[in-house]
């Protein structure tokens, strides 16, 4: 993976629905320009001038994990092309992502997931086993 990131100029995620978007987060940690859609969780972790606007679309039919009628983003392909052209014309190979680094640093991960999440679950378990609520 490191070799792929080293050879790349820019990371593009043009998805209709995305959770955190670990590929985009990994690229941001490596200070690559990142193009993402506004629909999903990536914008919570990555600040970039390249956020593609999305309309809403309903899925027309059931698929493996998805049901007809579910709503997803419908990213603007014209805006994607403008962002890609802009990054190319500026010859961007570096973009600082302090928010992403702060959210993914060891100290924050330990606090958010180990102390806050696991710690709270342990408190809930010990309270329930002692008969307290």
PLM-predicted stretches and their roles:
Residues 3-8:
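Short alpha-helical donor nucleotide-sugar binding micro-motif in glycosyltransferases
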Residues 71-79, 88-118:
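A charged, aromatic-enriched C-terminal amphipathic alpha-helix characteristic of glycosyltransferases
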